[in-house]
Amino acid sequence: HTAYRRQRQMCIRDRYSTASVAQMVFAHILNICQQVQHHSEEVHKGRWTNNKDFCFWDTPLIELRDKKIGLVGLGNTGYTTARVAIGFGMQVYALTSKSHFQLPPEIKKMDLDQLFSECDIISLHCPLTPETHELVNARRLALMKPNAILINTGRGPLVNEQDLADALNSGKIYAAGVDVLSSEPPRADNPLLTAKNCYITPHIAWASTEARERLMNIAISNLQAYISGTPENVVNK
């Protein structure tokens, strides 16, 4: 890294978007489970107006209570996502280096393949490293239930996008909600752009007004502390 090579101090801006990213995880989950976007579009097309009943739906609607959510990583964002899931009455499982004794009783440990095979929803919260690159691949997608949902608000290259598109198009899994892709903006030939039941947002999980204000305030605080000779959040001391 340039900061290390030049012996410059580097300060991190941690946690500014934790709540916003967890919120986006559930924005995707709820959109998929309730088909919010689809039903709103159908109402505007007049399908509810022309329906004889007081209500109208044409896709399965899924309740989150008692569903199993598997979190790949349990850092700040993963843990915040877990708390929201617990609020919905979900069963929460996580791949984490923490021991059982370090976890609240509502969160249970699982290994990676077990998460993929047993959970109804998988949400990715791990850093991108050589070990986690394309950890979501054809082999692990084949472990998932046919009604399972994959959520990625972490890093695009955690997922082999062609393998995910193939799994969606063949019905091996039900749906995916992603806020990140392997290249951004996406190339026109990205297979997820045309994949069945793939909901994509343009890397906006972090970008709530509140999170961006928090980021600027942290950056200003870091700069002021550095100028005063007492830098904060230094990662390359």
Language-model region placement:
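Phosphate-binding beta-alpha-beta segment of Rossmann-like dinucleotide-binding domains, i.e.
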Residues: 15-68
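Active-site glycine-centered loops adjacent to acidic/histidine catalytic or metal-binding residues
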Residues: 14-15, 179, 203
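Adenosine-phosphate binding glycine-rich loop
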Residues: 187, 195-214
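NAD(P)-dependent dehydrogenase/reductase Rossmann-like domain
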Residues: 213-237
